[in-house]
Amino acid sequence: MPSTNRAGSLKDPEIAELFFKEDPEKLFTDLREIGHGSFGAVYFARDVRTNEVVAIKKMSYSGKQSTEKWQDIIKEVKFLQRIKHPNSIEYKGCYLREHTAWLVMEYCLGSASDLLEVHKKPLQEVEIAAITHGALQGLAYLHSHTMIHRDIKAGNILLTEPGQVKLADFGSASMASPANSFVGTPYWMAPEVILAMDEGQYDGKVDVWSLGITCIELAERKPPLFNMNAMSALYHIAQNESPTLQSNEWSDYFRNFVDSCLQKIPQDRPTSEELLKHMFVLRERPETVLIDLIQRTKDAVRELDNLQYRKMKKLLFQEAHNGPAVEAQEEEEEQDHGVGRTGTVNSVGSNQSIPSMSISASSQSSSVNSLPDASDDKSELDMMEGDHTVMSNSSVIHLKPEEENYQEEGDPRTRASDPQSPPQVSRHKSHYRNREHFATIRTASLVTRQMQEHEQDSELREQMSGYKRMRRQHQKQLMTLENKLKAEMDEHRLRLDKDLETQRNNFAAEMEKLIKKHQAAMEKEAKVMANEEKKFQQHIQAQQKKELNSFLESQKREYKLRKEQLKEELNENQSTPKKEKQEWLSKQKENIQHFQAEEEANLLRRQRQYLELECRRFKRRMLLGRHNLEQDLVREELNKRQTQKDLEHAMLLRQHESMQELEFRHLNTIQKMRCELIRLQHQTELTNQLEYNKRRERELRRKHVMEVRQQPKSLKSKELQIKKQFQDTCKIQTRQYKALRNHLLETTPKSEHKAVLKRLKEEQTRKLAILAEQYDHSINEMLSTQALRLDEAQEAECQVLKMQLQQELELLNAYQSKIKMQAEAQHDRELRELEQRVSLRRALLEQKIEEEMLALQNERTERIRSLLERQAREIEAFDSESMRLGFSNMVLSNLSPEAFSHSYPGASSWSHNPTGGPGPHWGHPMGGTPQAWGHPMQGGPQPWGHPSGPMQGVPRGSSMGVRNSPQALRRTASGGRTEQGMSRSTSVTSQISNGSHMSYT
């Protein structure tokens, strides 16, 4: 366990700042225990620095559950530091000493429950309204700061001497709203607090419910169901209707206020701010109503304490002589007079720890502590200035006369115009008046009984404490499981997001690599085409040079042959003069040379035209080849994008299935845990109820045994009583006999006295015999009647107890059945909500996939359209340039024999598919004839003087010149079969099977 969580550890600076470093034993003196509870004890003390009276609550954080106790102390100190309001207890500081926290607070007179205890009757409606108004103001302050008190009751509503109402005991409070802890005092708990772990969270409206119960408590001296077992009261509150005021004497405003506070459904219950506008608290009432009530209570406390004091003095002096007794009586009267002036003090705090003390002395002792999250309820000791005689359990401390005069000068009724907001001057005066003494509205017997009940009710209190501890542990286990599953879910979600991000990054890298590869391929193709064009030109030029040389050789041979023929013709004709022959021969030579020169010029011109035409054709074929390559590369890129998108969508669907499976598994785990905790809770509740039943039966049997044991004494007492009555009767008869005898003796002659005496004696004997018979009959009848009455009374008590316990057990079973049904309904609701969330998430995912696929298809179509349009523009621009240069489009579109000529070295690289195979055609199925898109291709024009060539057998309709012909492009752009053929396959398998040369059909 971390050191910061260990009980008493101050290593955490934030925790260390909560406590003062001084030694509290040196700062506070005259400590006297004035209250006790399960948390520890409350003491009256005086601050040596200011001589001010304070209340100190000592809370130990050692022993069992030390860590929980320490956390509760820290929480309460933090809460007290945060609140500053006239209607909340003033916090003065906290000190640590020997594993005990000293919580120092202002000192108040007592609680509203003390008023009920002292007066033994309900409060008046105007008094209840004043107390409720002050409590509501404090609650409105807490609720406005998202805090919940969670233990509102009369014992936690304190009063000061100026009549100010203050909320106390924040040990159960929550600094966050909403909350879901099972805390508070059973009889005052709201239904949503009892069902907190089963049905969810609650907010500050639980304090409004508790305030309504407190109003009934002030109006009827005890809260509803107080005569019921505390555990049974919980079950009753959770499933039965809200309580109401029983008496008809209360006003409609009060009834409506209580009914509003006790609305079973929290949403129908008003807030504390809304209740401050209710007519019940806004009605006009005397400003001194609480001051007068406090003064009457103090007077009553003084009378009760003086009565106890006189009883004690009577016991002390009952054996003394008359003289000392008279002196003691006189002294008692003088002291009574002094007490009447100065008053008494029995300072104790509110009795939050033992609710039975906040009711009456005769109320049952089965009430339990109000516990906070980890320990029992703490009572904030209330106490301030006031009366001047301090009573401990066995002594009375009198004050000096000058203190009495100072008390009279500082009478709060002469300086407190507003009981809710006393001025600072009165506070300053009360501070000095409060230096030497403190006042109270509680009797000494109440303090003593509080301590005794705390010791006697330990078993019941421990049972409730254990039950609340179990509920907190169950809630902690459930929260721990939920946090664990939430962390697992977050980790799983992060892992899935990371996998998806990794895949997307890999896809982006692959696509970037592919684009770079395509760019390199285009650059390489451009270089190859430039080299091919250069080689093509060189090849044609070489052929033309060879043809020219051959032509020149042929001309030389022809010239030589013609020259020889001419010479032979001249030689045959001997008649022609030699000179003429020479001239004719020269002229013929010149003609031959001129003709040959013209033929040579014509050949050179034809060769130049052929070279220009073939180069232009070659460039067009290169352009078409580049377009085909671009189409192949774009097709490969789009197919790659399609494959990646399909793989990404497949991963998203797998992740959705994985998240769905994990969510259902987590929900099942939480629901199983909740069912198990409910089972354990119900088992504990049943065990506690059975133990309570056994304890009640055991107590009743013990009571009956004591009655049986006490019966002989009772019978003896009855017999003595009858005997005394008989003796009295005998004495009366004896006196009557004597009076009658004297009368007869006086009225009868003396001679008859003997007979008269004998007759009277016989009559007396007969009457005494009858009286003796009556005495025996009375004794026997009394014995039989008493035994029968005892048996009948005990049997009736047993029957009543059995019926009561059976009703409580049935109430528990009904409560547990309701909890199980609510849990099942909650589980079904959670399952339906999860299914709806999963279905919605799946629908959104599928919609997203569909939108992405549609966007990808649109992008694909747009890319293809823009590519074809650009290529069509390039072809059109090229053809326009060709027309300007004097080339016919028909001639350029028809393939020359050299289109597939491989006769020159290295001429094969430009005409093959750069991607490794014949790519598919854009706009027609694979294997389909391109004749559907272009005109039949005829062989190229025969070269001059070369009717046959190596490219004479070129197949008609070759795709080289068709795929990007203007006619095909125009058909594609105008929406021919190409658009239907561009529909892509959505299957990853079809793409992979077709590879990068996938058909767009």
From Swiss-Prot:
Residue intervals of the Protein kinase domain: 28-281
Where is the segment annotated Disordered? 324-380, 404-433, 567-587, 905-1001
The record's SMART domains line, in alphabetical order, gives: S_TKc
Q: GO cellular component annotations, sorted alphabetically?
A: cytosol; microtubule cytoskeleton; nuclear body; perinuclear region of cytoplasm; plasma membrane
Any one GO molecular function term: protein serine/threonine kinase activity
Description of how activity is regulated: Serine/threonine-protein kinase activity is inhibited by SPRED1.
A Pfam family that this protein carries is Pkinase
**Reported modifications of this chain:** Proteolytically processed by caspase-3 (CASP3). Autophosphorylated. Phosphorylated by ATM in response to DNA damage. Phosphorylated by LRRK2.
State where the protein is found: Cytoplasm
User: What does the record give as EC number?
Assistant: 2.7.11.1
What's the protein called, per UniProt? Serine/threonine-protein kinase TAO1
Comp. bias regions, Basic and acidic residues? 577-587
- Where does this protein have compositionally biased stretches of type Low complexity? 350-370, 921-930
Q: Which residues bind ATP?
A: 34-42, 57
Regions of biased composition (Polar residues) lie at 975-1001
Subunit (UniProt): Self-associates. Interacts with MAP2K3. Interacts with SPRED1. Interacts with TESK1; the interaction inhibits TAOK1 kinase activity. Interacts with MAP3K7.
Which SUPFAM superfamilies does the entry link to? Protein kinase-like (PK-like)
Which residues are catalytic?
151
Q: Which GO terms describe its biological process?
A: central nervous system neuron development; DNA damage response; DNA repair; execution phase of apoptosis; microtubule cytoskeleton organization; mitotic G2 DNA damage checkpoint signaling; negative regulation of microtubule depolymerization; neuron cellular homeostasis
Give the species. Answer: Mus musculus
Question: What would be the name of the gene that encodes this protein?
Answer: Taok1
Which reaction is the catalytic activity of this chain?
L-seryl-[protein] + ATP = O-phospho-L-seryl-[protein] + ADP + H(+); L-threonyl-[protein] + ATP = O-phospho-L-threonyl-[protein] + ADP + H(+)
The UniProt function text for this chain reads: Serine/threonine-protein kinase involved in various processes such as p38/MAPK14 stress-activated MAPK cascade, DNA damage response and regulation of cytoskeleton stability. Phosphorylates MAP2K3, MAP2K6 and MARK2. Acts as an activator of the p38/MAPK14 stress-activated MAPK cascade by mediating phosphorylation and subsequent activation of the upstream MAP2K3 and MAP2K6 kinases. Involved in G-protein coupled receptor signaling to p38/MAPK14.
User: Per the similarity annotation, which family is this?
Assistant: Belongs to the protein kinase superfamily. STE Ser/Thr protein kinase family. STE20 subfamily.
Where would one find coiled-coil regions in this protein?
458-651, 754-877
